[in-house]
């Protein structure tokens, strides 16, 4: 992972509770293409975005 983490070892988010910025990245005011990019990069998809 790059950026955001200050600890020596970045820990993956718990299942069902990704970090807030990923939720925002995937779900909040994004176009479909941006949401897809977030899905590909972070594995965080917002299925409400069509």
Swiss-Prot record:
Disulfide bond listed as a keyword: yes
GO biological process, one term: defense response to bacterium
Cysteine pairings via disulfide bonds: 25-38, 27-45, 39-46
UniProt subcellular location: Cytoplasmic granule
Tissue spec. comment: Higher expression in hemocytes and to a lesser extent in heart, testis, gills, intestine, lymphoid organ and hepatopancreas. Traces in eyes and subcuticular epithelium. Not present in the brain.
Keywords linked to the UniProt accession: Antibiotic, Antimicrobial, Chitin-binding, Disulfide bond, Fungicide
Superkingdom as given in the UniProt entry: Eukaryota
One cellular component (GO) term of this entry: cytoplasm
KW Membrane (keyword) present: no
Molecular function terms from GO: chitin binding
InterPro entries: Penaeidin (IPR009226)
Function comment: Antibacterial activity against M.luteus and E.coli bacteria. Antifungal activity against N.crassa and F.oxysporum. Presents chitin-binding activity.
Family statement drawn from the similarity comment of this UniProt entry: Belongs to the penaeidin family.
Protein known as: Penaeidin-1
